[in-house]
Amino acid sequence: GPGVCLKSEAMNLAVITELPLVVLDVQRGGPSTGLPTKSEQTDLLQALFGRNGESPMPVIAASSPTNCFDAAYMASKIALEHMTPVVLLTDGFVANGSGAWKLPKLADYPAITPPYVTPEMKDNYTPYKRNPETGVRYWAIPGQEGYMHILGGLEKDSNTGAISTDPENHNLMCHLRAEKVAKIPVPDVEVQGCADDADLLIVGFG
């Protein structure tokens, strides 16, 4: 709700810098202050489109209190492996709910493998050097010798990482960021009931 409105600038910064970030949104009734103690799934469109410019990001919704751990883990995996902010939607019922939950073993979860730079990249590293298959830029952690670079909210040149206002470069970078997000695998949609002769389709999330 209003909290996510105030965070949209930081979310947009994570989009253009291509840094991992998980934003947890506990939805409530709106608009404005609205219904601050009541539950409502009001922020889906805001999570998808509520930023300026071309700034796509994945959105995940938790379905129950016990599902929150799995959803948060997958949101973190997507953010870290694809160098993108991810929004995790919950709501008042989920946030205030409870349920029996067995502490999982991390070995049962898929590994998280961030796209860190490698030593052989040092000679030709640029901040937006990308994996040719996934489109994800490689991640140089601050302090790594030989990988000094500058990030920020200004558009950068796709090759050098320097500030650029060139329209062709900006168009390219917008497409590269969008294509990277579009390549993130999405699970198959689960259809319950017989879909062959149905007159009405109900789509739910969370």
Question: At which residue positions do the language-model features occur?
Answer:
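Glycine- and acidic
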Residues: 54-61, 197-200
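Flexible, low-complexity linker and terminal segments
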Residues: 71, 76-206
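Short C-terminal domain-edge/linker segments immediately following a structured domain
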Residues: 27-30, 52-57, 90-92, 117-122
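Short, flexible turn/loop "capping" segments at secondary-structure junctions
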Residues: 49-53, 194-195
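Thiamine diphosphate
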Residues: 1-49, 58-80
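Flexible, active-site-adjacent loop/turn segments at secondary-structure boundaries
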Residues: 2-4, 42-45, 57-58, 92, ...
